Amino acid sequence: LTRGDLAAEHPLACRLAAEMPRPLVLFFATLLHDIGKDLGGRHHPERGAELSRVVLERLGVAESDIVEVQHHVLKHLRMYHVATRRDIDDPQTLEEFTADVRGREGLRELYLLTLADVTTTSPGSMTSWKRRMLDELYVAAERHLAGAPARGPARSEAVKQEVLALWKDEDDRGFFEHFLSALPERYLYANDPREIVDHALFAKLAQEKPASIRVLTKSDPYVELCVVADDRPGLLAMITATFSHAKLKVFSAQIYSWTGQDGRTRSLDVFWVRSGQEAEYAVKLVPGLERDLEALIAGKADPVEVATGARAQAKWSVRPTPPVATKVNVDNRSASNHTVIEVITRDRRGLLFWLSSTIQHVGLSISFAKINTEGERVADVFYVSDEAGGKILDEARIEELRHRILGTIARLDAGG
């Protein structure tokens, strides 16, 4: 990275590495970040921070540099977890993350350390999706530390004006202005202005259809899909059922509802997905995905049958894998306006469909989802709200939700 050898693969990282004012701190942090792994287990960052001081004092490193290295060793998992499991457009997430990084220089070093750590874990551990998530978190955190306004009328209006300047079709300006005002504010912050224009153009073309799916971008082997459909309870489960049927794996999802000029409530959802093959294969699946989703919306197909139709595997073809302990965490502290549900379990086809169905069956709405897979272990994270649009604060309801999710996973384990 510092030599620029990986500029084609990691342009942002190479630029930042070339501008590093204190490379010694980063090099020592990279060398020592896992020094506590054999001794500390789950708490190896804490143990590693202690041991790194011993090593660096023996080497005669300056006290100020030792403190910085210790901090990076202690926090070396933090950026990866936030990037792959949290909504980086939530101001509370950014506030808490940037409080951990010791300023803009600390952010730069933590980003480079995280990139080096993930990339060297195994040949396939760094994917283009993970790289994109890390890059986006770095840019958002840098903007936050630089004092850019996080949210509010001023920033919202600035984004709208930037987007409107890109809109070329004056005949449909009324539709576009309504589109911008009808979607929730977080949509404006979570998407690039050019992406918003693409979404609006697609939403206009899809007005007459109950469901439409379009490829937005391809970054082999990943594909970004936009789904515009008539909104209804359980729509996300229907969409993920079609993905499961086509053997597409979802890595992130943004879920938005808006009311069109004709009074219909529409959903605009953005997904990052991949198949087991190159991106072009997933592109060819889009017409079939549309047909399946239209059938589900019309009530002509059953979501469970669609989701499980391609799931059967001969027992002899399923290779044994290490067991993965299932954990369900329900968190009301990590997000400004949503309850965060984090499900860690063994990965399996259709898992997102079953989890989203379970969550929506108890009356909760999913606004955002992020899925991070590491080998056979998956962390599915959902940002949810109750019927009134707020957090789930009732402890009995939280326990019921946790119980239902665990029950769903137990049934999957039992083959039911």
Segments predicted by a language model, with ranges:
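Regulatory modules associated with amino-acid/nitrogen control
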Residues: 92, 96-416
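Conserved catalytic alpha/beta cores of large enzymes that bind or transform nucleotide phosphates
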Residues: 5, 56, 62-66, 81, ...
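Active-site-adjacent "gating/activation" loops or surface patches in catalytic cores
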Residues: 1-30, 35, 219, 322, ...
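Divalent metal-dependent catalytic cores for phosphoryl transfer on phosphate-bearing substrates
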Residues: 16-147
